Amino acid sequence: MKTIIDNFVDRVIEYGMYNEIDKIYVKNRVLALIGEEGTDRISDENDLKQIKDYLVEIALKNGKIKDLIEEKECLGAELMNFIVPLPSRLNDIFWSSYDISPQEAVEEFYKLSKDSDYIKTSAIAKNIEFRASTKYGELEITINLSKPEKDPKTIAAEKLVKATNYPKCLLCMENEGYQGRINYPARSNHRIIRLKLGDEVWGFQYSPYLYFNEHAIFLNSQHVPMAITSKTFEQLLEIVDILPGYFAGSNSDLPISGGSILSHNHYQGGKHIFPMEKAKFESEFRFKDFEDVNAGIVKWPMSVIRLQSENKNRLLDLATKILNKWREYSDLEVDIIAMTEDVPHHTVTPIARKVDGRYELDIVLRDNHTTEQYPDGVFHPHQDVQHIKKENIGLIEVMGLAILPPRLKPELEEVGKYLLGEDNAIADYHLEWADQLKEKYPRINKEEVNSVVQHEAGQVFARVLEDAGVYKNTPSGHEAFMRFVKSVGIN
């Protein structure tokens, strides 16, 4: 039997970062972090992350850290950093492996990101995930419970921390190996693969809180704002060449219609087939001078033009033409406004794929203008569906995966109780919806109530996406969509 400290050190050495001769050195470096008291307890635990958690508790008892989630996270990341190679070494390993098998190189990097607890697999497992059948196919729903809530002690401690602008944001290269602090996540065990996209250096990493399989983030090595241009399409298509089986997409570059981080240019990708990818063409056509590119409108709640070609450059040129036209295009009949004075309202959310040697680019048209009636955005979730989703509709939602806030776990349970006629604490903003459900399901029972509420939450998400779609799925909406397509030029 081994002591807990020796058990940890042996596991570290198994990962190949250190040799047997380094054993005493590694042990002493760990003791420096956690203190010496309590490390002689016997442990036969095999899971490295579990051993790490025990060591963090020892450090707490030894007064090395305070009883704050953030301090525990910082120390935990520092301990798991023992199994992760230096960035230079990891990049050498990745690209050497890539030369033999790109898929294997990616799988190894993904595994290391999970093994080192950079990807928070235990926290992600808390998420509630379900699917809902809609007229657009099966949509995916996640109630996000993975990110820890701040407790009052943390909030109080944050007020005492001096402001700093290092790293500038969560997507900067400077996060690699960053210790973390009370108001900033621990990144000691974080590594980034460098890759060239055209003439720029970018980083490839995974999201610590995955929303889907192999959820990757690609970030510009420079802290520059989001910008959708011809270069965006070029880089997305390059990523799907570099990483076989991955899609790559970008949030839009304007507020309301984009993601939560507009200050740092980045893309997302991964190995997941989203509901939108499964959606078929509603109508097909050929753009003028691009007869070799398959094109059409996708049967989807948002307004999507899909382009397909084996010729990447032709796809790139046509996508750029569509983007440039959309930037300046207005159609007041359907409340589509490209510009208010000097403020632009039009952009796109692009998604690239490569399937069986053929490139595919989905161009989702976005408009972020507001009115008195819709102060949050004309093409933003409207007031009557904000009880389920009021946040911006970014890339992941666009593709058919709802990321819903933690509040919905208890709130949907209360909706279920309300439908059953039981004592409940239903939130006021769910009442109108719940009454509609009561009318729709007058004889609902306990066995089915949960699946009914989940199914109906999925229908609300479909409506959320319809709200964000600039052209509605009506005859007049389709007619207006075709007016734009014709303005680009079709045969």
Curated annotation (Swiss-Prot):
Pfam families per record: GalP_UDP_tr_C, GalP_UDP_transf
EC supergroup of this enzyme: transferase
Main location: cytoplasm
Enzyme Commission number, as recorded: 2.7.7.12
InterPro entries from the UniProt entry: GalP_uridyl_Trfase_II, GalP_uridyl_Trfase_II_CS, GalP_Utransf_C, GalP_Utransf_N
Pathway: Carbohydrate metabolism; galactose metabolism
A biological process term (GO) from this entry: galactose metabolic process
Compartment list: Cytoplasm
Highest rank taxon of the organism: Bacteria
Molecular function terms from GO: UDP-glucose:hexose-1-phosphate uridylyltransferase activity
Keywords: Carbohydrate metabolism, Cytoplasm, Galactose metabolism, Nucleotidyltransferase, Transferase
Chemical reaction(s) catalysed: alpha-D-galactose 1-phosphate + UDP-alpha-D-glucose = alpha-D-glucose 1-phosphate + UDP-alpha-D-galactose
CC per GO annotation: cytoplasm
Family that this chain belongs to: Belongs to the galactose-1-phosphate uridylyltransferase type 2 family.
HAMAP family: GalP_UDP_trans (MF_00571)
Record-given protein name: Galactose-1-phosphate uridylyltransferase 1
Species of provenance: Streptococcus pneumoniae (strain ATCC BAA-255 / R6)
